[in-house]
Amino acid sequence: MEDHSVTHAEAIAAAIDVLDRHFAALNAGDAVALARTLHFPHYRLAGGSMQVWQRPDNYLEDFLARAGDDWHHSTLDFRKPIACSADKVHLDVQFSRYRADGSVLGRYRSIWVVARIDQRWAAQLRSSFAA
């Protein structure tokens, strides 16, 4: 049931906050904080296959393997809402991955679905063009 006490502006702000916290935790290598930004099971569609994490156990480790040895940090280039309800926001996202020297490894587009489940906002799934 949709909670009309939450405005679309509040839902969008909550979803953007989730992404900001996700990237901060990712860059800090903080697996606990990173897990707080995700609902589990968590789904990622990329490279023609769906990856599913039932629990947060290997999420950071799996990311580091995907990003490669040259990865140092990532930044959000933009995160734009494309659809919204009081309990779910779809975001058009572009992020960049960088080496330690500041050179760009790549820029990638993705769609993130951030949802409020059991009164907690977190990313439920995404479709990404990143490796």
Regions found by a protein language model. Give the residues of each.
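Hydrophobic/aromatic beta-strand elements that line small-molecule binding cavities or substrate pockets
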Residues: L76-I82, Q94-R97, R109-A115
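Residue-level recognition of beta-strand termini and adjacent short loop/turns
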Residues: A83-D87
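Short, low-complexity N-terminal intrinsically disordered segments enriched in polar/charged residues
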Residues: M1-F40, P56-D57
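Short, well-ordered beta-strand segments in beta-rich or mixed alpha/beta enzyme
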Residues: H22, L34, R44, K88-R97
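A solvent-exposed, acidic/Ser-Thr-rich amphipathic alpha-helical stretch
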Residues: A31-K80
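Short beta-strand edge/turn micro-motifs at domain boundaries
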Residues: L105-A131
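Short beta-strand segments enriched in hydrophobic/aromatic residues
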Residues: L38-H39, F95-R97, S127
